[in-house]
A protein has these predicted regions:
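Flanking helices and flexible, charged tails adjoining ferredoxin-like Fe-S electron-transfer domains
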Residues: 200, 364-373, 383, 396, ...
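Short beta-alpha connecting loops at secondary-structure transitions
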Residues: 257-263, 284, 307, 414-422, ...
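A short helix-to-beta-strand connector/capping loop
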Residues: 305, 437-444, 478-481, 555-557, ...
Length: 673
């Protein structure tokens, strides 16, 4: 019997059956607009279908040019587009899967000048102001949705998902925040929800009755003047009556200032929201957000919070998620850690999606995994992210890999990251690598510091020896008050009540998060997370915001973060997560000061110049987070001995601690060697 009986139970939809309860949620990949995008998307989706996903939803495709995500974005409004899409649907069907096209009109979020919305109100995350739709333009758009659905059916899709959540066009009609009309498309809620209902009716009429229609409904807007639970319930009933097959419950607008999918969000944090609709409708409900583990999904389904679970990024992290779970090999799942660094953060700067823990995601055709033509004896020095990625992938191809590390455990910088409140998921990546090292027969030698002579018998050596913290040239840098971030995070050096952190990059923010944490991290407690971020769990307020707002605990220490640069502290943090770290630290009372000159460190504290004024920061500790130097001492003697040496990870480029680059480097080299 399966360990996950609810997860692998089929779902009967009347005219078709889904083989299990998992939806691969919509993700824009950046492939949708590329010349070879159809081939790459076909490979991407087909691999997930092959391993058992019941129903895949594509990235959002606009029904009209006004609704694209950005200039040049993908549209499906003409038969000339069908061949592109048939390539994708054929590939999925050949693997026994089903696939639905997401119809997405981005409304006032469309990042191009010709955007439209119910009212001419600029979104806080867009520099363009939308044109207010006329009555006739609204009718045309409804027909555009229906036409897009018809074309999707002709292209071989098994259904469509009508995107009515996350603050996009349909959601904008629903909320008083963005709909200030006083005609038949605005005013009271009955008129505000008319557009959504008419879209679903038109889609059903045009696409036929034996066609899946998922409606993504915003359950929890997390913005002021959003929808109430009563309104959401009324809409859900109307959407069912209009012809939807399934309702997928969305959480949060893109402009919301509450985290909904990043690592600090507890697993399955919002399934309780979906459950509130269970008695209101008779069609299946999908719950979503931070479901990255088969047991979490099973528990949600078993207690009746939803009929299906949606997972998106977990299928970037591991295409084999479902087959591994079904074969009772969940320990081999490469878990999504919710970092967003290689997926959403790349999409928002116009790059193709990938995955920090799985660089092959969306690059399957460019990074094939082939058996090694001539297996080699390979030495890998350093069991951090880069070395682990190389060792596992090279061994999987048939190479004989020996992995050395001077420390008693694998992980390198990930052993630092996993201690940061809100980054507990990094434990999962190390669990995955430990499992795969054993599975692929890597000879792991911990507590082993090697010399160049120890490596001479190997065919090639891969140096993944990482970095050493860099100490800036400040008078008094050797004072007992001074600690490196490794002293604090790895060695647990005592830290006093008043702290200055030099450096506002990623490691500086991590150190500040660690030192400012009071009690247990809310990333492990859904109730406390909702309280901390001001989510009204009764759902009585419009938008689901608690009247008292966020309740983030104050730091037990006085902390000031400093940087030499005049730019905003944390400017280099991820676009989708940096604001969370800044907001958290500021709410805790942490100060951030740019454009600082460091004069000296002595018994009194840290002497600085800020804005031309000399100041004394009377602190107990000065924690240095000001960059790092590569550790590559073994490279020159090995090369002098005529050996082939490869540098990956921090020992190659130490400018920033970049796990995405490190794992990608290790993986690419392993697939090529």
């Amino acid at each position: 019997m399966s360990r996950y009986p609810s997860l692998f139970a089929p779902l009967e939809l009347g005219f078709t059956t889904l083989k299990n309860r998992v939806l691969m949620g919509s993700m824009h990949t950046g492939l949708e607009e590329l010349p070879d995008g159809a081939q790459r998307l076909a490979a991407f989706y087909a691999e997930r279908a092959r391993h058992g996903v019941a129903l895949i939803v594509t990235g959002g495709i606009a029904p009209a040019p006004s609704g694209v995500t950005m200039a040049g974005g993908a549209v499906l409004n003409d038969a000339s587009h069908l061949a592109h899409h048939r390539h994708i649907t054929d590939a999925v069907h050949q693997e026994g899967g089903k696939i639905a096209l997401q119809i997405l009109h981005t409304g006032r979020y469309s990042y191009q000048p010709a955007l439209v919305a119910p009212s001419a109100l600029q979104a806080p995350i867009n520099r363009f102001t939308p044109h207010e739709l006329s009555h006739d333009e609204i009718l045309t758009l409804i027909d555009d949705f229906a036409h897009c659905a018809q074309l999707a059916r002709e292209a071989g899709y098994d259904g469509v998902e009508v995107m009515g959540s996350e603050g996009y066009l349909i959601n904008e009609f629903l909320a008083a925040r963005t709909n200030q009309r006083d005609d038949q498309w605005g005013g009271d809620y009955a008129r505000r929800m008319r557009f959504a209902i008419e879209v679903v009716k038109a889609v059903r009429q045009r696409a036929g009755h034996d066609f899946i229609i998922i409606y993504r409904l915003s359950m929890l807007d997390l913005v002021n003047d959003g929808s109430t639970l009563a309104e959401v319930t009324e809409l859900a009933k109307a959407i069912e009556a209009a012809g939807a097959t399934i309702i997928n419950t969305g959480i949060g607008w893109h402009e919301a200032r509450i985290p909904t999918i990043a690592t600090p969000v507890p697993r399955g944090a919002f399934s309780w929201v979906t459950r509130k609709l269970k008695d209101a409708v008779s069609i299946p409900l999908i719950t979503t957000n931070r479901i990255n583990d088969p047991q979490v999904a099973e528990d949600i389904l078993a207690r009746g919070d939803a009929d299906m679970v949606s997972m998106a990024r977990p299928f970037l992290a591991d295409a084999e998620f479902m087959s591994k779970a079904q074969r009772d090999r969940a320990g081999e799942i490469n878990t999504c850690i919710g970092c967003n660094q290689a997926c959403l953060d790349r999409i928002f700067v116009g790059k193709v999606t990938s995955c920090l823990v799985n660089p092959r995601a969306c690059h399957e055709t460019l990074m094939p995994v082939l058996p090694a033509n001539a297996p080699k004896r390979l030495a890998v020095v350093g069991a951090g992210p880069a070395g682990l990625a190389f060792a596992v992938n090279a061994a999987a191809r048939g190479h004989h890999v020996t992995l050395f590390d001077a420390l008693p455990e694998i992980g390198g910088q990930f052993n630092i990251a996993k201690q940061i409140p809100g980054k507990e998921e990094f434990h999962e990546t190390l669990r995955y690598y430990r499992t795969m090292l054993d599975l692929h027969g890597v000879d792991l030698r911990l507590n082993t510091r090697v010399t160049a002579d120890d490596l001479l018998t190997f065919d090639e050596t891969i140096l993944a020896t990482g970095i050493a913290p860099r100490l800036p040239a400040i008078d008094g840098i050797d004072h007992p008050k001074v600690l490196s971030y490794l002293d604090v995070l790895r060695d647990k050096a005592p830290v006093g009540a008043k702290v200055a952190i030099i450096g506002c990059g990623g490691i500086g923010f991590d150190t500040a998060m660690y030192l400012s944490q009071s009690g247990a991290a809310t990333s492990q407690d859904i109730g406390e997370f909702c309280r901390e971020w001001g989510i009204d769990t009764s759902l009585q307020t419009a938008g689901g915001l608690h009247p008292e707002g966020p309740q983030l605990s104050k730091s037990p220490r006085q902390i000031v973060m400093l940087q030499r640069k005049a730019s905003k502290p944390g400017e280099g943090l991820g676009k989708t997560t940096g604001w969370i770290h800044r907001a958290t630290l500021l709410a805790r009372g942490v100060k951030m000061i740019p454009a600082v000159s460091y004069e000296k460190i002595d018994d009194e504290g840290l002497h600085v110049t800020i804005g031309g004024e000399r100041q004394l920061l009377a602190v107990d500790q000065v924690v240095i987070c000001a960059g790092q130097e590569p550790r590559r001492e073994l490279a020159d003697p090995l090369r002098a001995a005529g050996k082939t040496v490869h540098l990956i990870g921090g020992c190659d480029v130490a400018a920033e601690l970049d796990a995405r680059r490190a794992i990608a480097q290790g993986t690419k080299l392993a697939l090529a060697i």
